[in-house]
Amino acid sequence: MALLASDVPLAPGTTGRAPEALLEPAELAEQRLLAAVAALPPDDAAEPYNEAQDGPWHQARLLLRLHRYAHEVVLGTSDPSLAGPGHALDLHRDAVEAAAAAAAAARTPRIAPATAYALGVLHADQRHEVEAARAVFRETWPYTAAMTAP
């Protein structure tokens, strides 16, 4: 006998279908996302080479994905207003990883100066892409009140 994903029991003692049973966790996921976005460093604190600020952005990306999945389960459809911010955070993650890889490669012992220079330029370019992705996220984030919360 085959079960559809919507028919799989969620936990022992859980009654009802998935959308009803997951309403409260979905609301919690949204609250966590809004809190994470509100905690992001402000624009004026942004520096292109500040890797210490990457962590909160990665956390916001993970929580956005969790919120999108919960939204799809509870409401049966994805929220199109979150596609742009989600894409921006994906680009952010890619640029952060590329910058870190370039920096690590540049620290290789006995690397040719020209190669080290090229990797440094690549690192700088990727850190600027990080800032560009953050700006796109801020522009496309549909809940502007969360961006200005203290």
Residue ranges and their predicted role:
Residues 1-150:
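Cationic, histidine-enriched alpha-helical/coil surfaces that engage anionic ligands
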